[in-house]
Amino acid sequence: MSYSSQVKRAGTHRVIKMLLLLTSAVLLASAPTLGQQQYVSRYDLFAGYTFLDSPKVKLFENGFHFQFGVRPKRWYSLGFDYSVSGGSLTLTPNLLTPAWQQQLGGLLQELGAAGQLPPGYTVVVPANSLTQTLTAGPQLAYRHFSKVTLFVRPDLGAIHEVATPQPKDPITKLIVGALTPTGKKTDWTVFYGFGGGIDFLFSKHIALRVQADLVYNHLFSDILQDGRLTTRFSVGPCFNFGKNIPK
């Protein structure tokens, strides 16, 4: 793993720890204020920062997350979820399908026989990435705390990714030319998983939302042999508006 990737992973772990500590502190502080929330709005809107982390392909992206929800009842809502983020990933031969690994092995053998392969050479292809996610569905809420709302949800949606390889030497340029003749790789597929989070209520209409999702997808299945798990963390303001939903 490169130094920059290690820094990103360390940053991810620090963010997760900070979010867990913040959640614990707020829950402890809200313990004396147990009780059902008196005001629950019909609609909510979230817009904030997000990051995606897929260790399988060393992907890390920063971006924007948007949600809009309608609450038919106090305990559940139906909503729309969209995120867009950009960053980088890294491809290595072990991630490729057996057919592509065999083709790559043949190419490296030819280069070695011609004396064009440096001693100890390893194939590493960095790439810039842009990812969009789109989903819609239900979310369940627990409102036992007057200042805190807990929620969970299933995740089922579509993910679209554009990967643009950044070859660093003539050999990786040859490999990229075979994998992506157009200079970039685009794909979309379905993902599934689960998510949840916490709304910290500052007033009837304004809250801080902290949330996370863990999903599985298999993007670029024509060249990558395995799917991958992706974590998405988001934080930002949430706005509640509309009429109060009666109990």
Where are these regions (language model features)?
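Repeated loop/turn-to-beta-strand initiation elements of outer-membrane beta-barrel proteins
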Residues: 43, 75-80, 146-148, 200, ...
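Short sequence motifs at beta-strands and strand-loop junctions characteristic
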Residues: 39, 58-61, 126-133, 184-191, ...
